[in-house]
């Protein structure tokens, strides 16, 4: 627990977590113990196949997950965007580029982004990403630890670009 307390200092008793992995999974068990020690409210989903329906109801601030969960979120977002009109697809792809520049090139490195990137992110990309995150129940997320297998760089970068803080 000590290592979690050092690395995850922003977790407080005001946070909520969603548990959907089996408790036999060591990652879920360790994460839940950490949450209990911090006083974090844990919602237990007994139907993992329905996680996409339940997430918007719970809207956790923290949640441990295996890469497969994020692969499914990524696929669902891409399916939705690819089924949208061409104009919306173009806007979303442009917004992802802006999000990557702002969140990965600058923000993650502790730098301020150029004015044009910052404004494009604030007024166009971020509101669009907020809608995506809200639909997935990830709009309250502070951070989401991932372990158990390798998460593809493309998915990790996409999630960071839209403002989902995956700790990997």
Residue ranges of model-derived segments:
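Alpha-helical hydrophobic/aromatic positions enriched in membrane-embedded helices and signal peptides
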Residues: 14-20, 140, 144
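Conserved AMP-binding/adenylation subdomain of ANL enzymes
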Residues: 1-16, 23-126, 165
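Conserved AMP-binding/adenylate-forming
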Residues: 120-168
């Amino acid at each position: 627990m000590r290592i979690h307390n050092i690395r995850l200092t922003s977790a407080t008793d005001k946070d909520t977590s969603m548990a959907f992995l089996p408790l036999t999974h060591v990652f879920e068990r360790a994460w839940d113990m950490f949450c209990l020690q911090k006083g974090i409210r844990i919602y237990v989903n007994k139907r993992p196949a329905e996680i996409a329906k339940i997430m918007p109801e719970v809207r956790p601030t923290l949640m441990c997950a295996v890469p497969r969960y994020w692969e499914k979120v990524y696929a669902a977002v891409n399916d939705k965007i690819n089924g949208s009109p061409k104009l919306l697809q173009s806007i979303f792809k442009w917004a992802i580029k802006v999000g990557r520049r702002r969140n990965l090139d600058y923000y993650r490195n502790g730098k301020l982004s150029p004015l044009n990137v910052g404004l494009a992110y604030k007024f166009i990309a971020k509101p669009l990403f907020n809608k995506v995150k809200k639909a997935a129940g990830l709009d309250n997320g502070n951070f989401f630890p991932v372990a158990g297998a390798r998460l593809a760089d493309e998915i990790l970068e996409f999630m960071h670009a839209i403002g989902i803080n995956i700790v990997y």
